[in-house]
UniProtKB/Swiss-Prot annotation:
It is found in: Cytoplasm. One of its GO terms (cellular component) is cytoplasm. This is Protein-L-isoaspartate O-methyltransferase. GO terms for molecular function: protein-L-isoaspartate (D-aspartate) O-methyltransferase activity. The keyword Cytoplasm applies. Its main location: cytoplasm. It comes from Pseudomonas syringae pv. syringae (strain B728a). InterPro entries: PCMT, SAM-dependent_MTases_sf. The gene is pcm. Belongs to the methyltransferase superfamily. L-isoaspartyl/D-aspartyl protein methyltransferase family. Keywords: Cytoplasm, Methyltransferase, S-adenosyl-L-methionine, Transferase. The active site is at residue 60.
């Protein structure tokens, strides 16, 4: 279930799917995904698939975690990254091992509390959490070198663009229902460059915190 061989099979699949950043692969290899899902689903933790985590939310497919992390890091090391949608905390844990500091925003208090516990268990101390509306980001601590959004937005939130540092990278799924596209947005000297990277499937980015 959680054997090294099972994890290696996942890494092999990610490589076959085009993930090439060795740091990202190493971090996913050593991060215990089974700790981020319900015990009843632990036997499926190293399958390359999204799994339910309650509250109508999911833990992202490992390929998508790797892909989004790789896109974020493509221009070099990052000091300060904001994550919109803590969820189970799995993507958070991966980011915490790849960048200096992670600022993670989650609207569902129950999910955030459990994610905090998991990161403490893994001794990942470079993450700060905010319970709030992901559409608003975390303006008090802006700007960020990177922003990653783990739910699909109907449009790119202006607040997130405003909080992106010069040269910063925003990785976000945009669309609705069956039509969703992963986008990479880079803050350039004279505005933003936008790159559409292909079809994806995420749960929606909703407004407002809930207990």
């Amino acid at each position: 279930m959680t054997s090294q061989r099972t994890r290696e099979r996942l890494i092999q699949r990610l490589c076959e799917e085009g993930i090439s950043n060795q740091r990202v692969l190493d971090v996913i290899r050593k991060t215990p995904r089974h700790l981020f899902v319900d015990e009843a689903l632990a036997h499926r933790a190293y399958e390359d698939t999204a799994l339910p985590i309650g509250h109508n939310q999911t833990i992202s497919q490992p390929y998508m975690v790797a892909r989004m992390s790789e896109l974020l890091l493509a221009a070099g090391p990052l000091d300060k990254v904001m994550e919109i949608g803590t969820g189970s905390g799995y993507q958070t844990a991966v980011l915490a091992q790849l960048v200096e500091r992670v600022f993670s925003v989650e609207r569902i208090k129950g999910l955030q509390d459990r994610a905090k516990e998991r990161l403490v268990e893994l001794n990942l101390r470079n993450v700060v959490f905010r319970w709030g509306d992901g559409w608003e980001g975390w303006p008090a601590l802006a700007p960020y070198n990177g922003i990653i959004v783990t739910a699909v937005a109907t449009d790119v939130p202006q607040a997130l663009l405003d909080q992106l540092a010069p040269g910063g990278r925003l990785v976000i799924p945009v669309g609705s229902g069956e039509v969703q596209q992963l986008m990479l947005i880079i803050r350039e000297e004279n505005g933003f460059s936008r790159h559409v990277l292909g079809a994806v499937r995420f749960v929606p980015l909703l407004n407002g915190p809930i207990a």
